[in-house]
């Protein structure tokens, strides 16, 4: 049973996290690849029975049918299923789909790896997540004894989120979060981007999950770097090398850590939302070889977060400093410690402001698109970046780095 939700090609989950202090956490994690289902020791009808069981679970959750959902489970999983039904009560028109990636049956036990997608009213595309299930044969047939996330849990496994909507936005918020204020801020940020990127088609709707605090955000998305206020995820399918252009965005979402966001001054709150929405808006244009410094440069500039003066001070010895050529490889900012991440964000902002001063915002966006051009290629990421700069802006990487440092 080949997975059907994820088409062939290079599929990855990209995460970018940004904070009011400049500590970010871009990460690239391979998404599970499609594999044929494997069965051992049982006839094919066991596989069919398990597939039917998985479909029953998805339908029961959609309908919030406690009896039907718990009837597919055994042991402690029944209690977790009851809670899931309770905690989806305020997610209107929930739609759930599952597709098996791997099925390994040994005797009366089965291990299942699957992709689950969910959608609530207002979402233009579902969000995908990887699950791992254990099932066992009982006198009543196959039952799920464990259903757990392989990466991030589902929102309703963390808290009873409520869905609210605004034009182009679906916000899931838990108890204790001022959804109205965040929704208003997000709507304003979307309008700002519409004005800043008039030639770009923005996402028809963006899924935003409000985490109450850093602990809840960690439950939803894994490790959260200190200082991160919001982050954006996208699951994308890349095309062939050398361009690695995005062929399809499979899923995308934002997470806002409300406890941190709420403490920021109003201008910084809005800047944070514009920054993360910029990452989301540019998902289709973000090649697999787009330098992390450039991705952050565009988001920092469009959100009005100018750190060019800080970059010059750092280059003069006032603090940690990092060159753009050190920030060309995927994950290069994520791998830095907190102090160095601040330097990386300052350098990225400095680069944006130099480019905009000389070539305008259109020049900055033209450079961004250049990494989708297969004709621009080099033996290393630094060489490719230098060639993209020369081709689009008539500027070398060395010249840009010198200008960022104020030399």
Language model features with spans:
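C-terminal motif of bacterial Sec signal peptides marking the signal peptidase cleavage site
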Residues: 14-17
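Short, low-complexity, disordered segments immediately C-terminal to signal peptides
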Residues: 19-44
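Short beta-strand edge/turn micro-motifs at domain boundaries
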Residues: 21, 124-161
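Acidic/histidine-rich, surface-exposed loop or edge segments in extracytoplasmic proteins
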Residues: 33-40, 51-54, 162-179
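Short solvent-exposed beta->alpha transition segments
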Residues: 37, 41-52, 56-107, 217, ...
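Surface-exposed, charged secondary-structure patches
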Residues: 84-129, 261-262, 274
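Juxtacatalytic substrate-recognition/specificity segment
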Residues: 165-291, 320, 384
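Acidic/His/Gly-enriched intrinsically disordered linker/tail segments
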Residues: 237-252, 267-272, 284-407
């Amino acid at each position: 049973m080949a997975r059907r939700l994820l088409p062939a090609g290079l599929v990855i989950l990209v995460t970018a996290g940004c904070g009011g202090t400049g500590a970010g956490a871009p990460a690239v994690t391979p998404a599970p690849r499609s594999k044929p289902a494997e069965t051992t020791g049982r006839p094919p009808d066991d596989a069919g029975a398990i597939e039917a069981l998985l479909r029953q679970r998805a339908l029961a959750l959609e309908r919030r049918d406690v009896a039907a959902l718990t009837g597919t489970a055994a042991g402690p999983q029944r209690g977790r299923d009851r809670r899931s039904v309770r905690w989806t009560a305020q997610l209107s028109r929930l739609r759930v789909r599952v597709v098996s990636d791997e099925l390994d049956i040994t005797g009366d036990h089965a291990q299942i790896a699957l992709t689950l997608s969910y959608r609530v009213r207002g979402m233009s595309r579902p969000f995908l997540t990887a699950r791992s299930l254990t099932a066992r044969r009982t006198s009543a047939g196959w039952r799920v004894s464990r259903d757990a996330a392989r990466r991030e849990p589902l929102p309703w496994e963390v808290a009873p989120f409520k869905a609210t909507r605004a034009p182009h936005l679906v916000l899931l918020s838990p108890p204790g979060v001022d959804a109205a204020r965040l929704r208003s801020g997000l709507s304003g940020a979307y309008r700002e981007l519409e004005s800043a990127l008039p030639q770009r088609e923005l996402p028809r709707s963006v899924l935003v999950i409000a985490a109450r605090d850093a602990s809840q955000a960690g439950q939803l998305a894994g490790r959260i770097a200190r200082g991160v206020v919001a982050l954006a995820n996208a699951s994308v399918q890349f095309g062939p090398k050398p361009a690695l252009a995005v062929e399809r965005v499979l899923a995308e979402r934002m997470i806002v850590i409300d406890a941190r966001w709420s403490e920021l001054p109003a201008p910084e709150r809005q800047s944070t939302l514009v920054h993360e929405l910029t990452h989301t808006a540019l998902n289709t244009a973000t090649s697999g070889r787009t330098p992390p410094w450039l991705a952050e440069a565009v988001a920092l500039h469009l959100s009005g977060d100018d750190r060019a003066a800080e970059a010059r001070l750092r280059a003069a010895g006032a603090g940690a400093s990092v060159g753009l050529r050190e920030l060309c490889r995927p994950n290069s900012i994520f791998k830095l410690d907190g102090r160095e991440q601040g330097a990386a964000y300052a350098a990225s902002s400095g680069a944006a402001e130099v480019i905009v001063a000389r070539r305008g915002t259109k020049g900055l966006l033209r450079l961004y698109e250049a990494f989708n051009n297969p004709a621009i290629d080099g033996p290393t990421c630094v060489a490719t970046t230098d060639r993209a700069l020369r081709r689009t802006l008539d500027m070398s990487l060395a010249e840009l780095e010198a200008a960022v440092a104020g030399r």
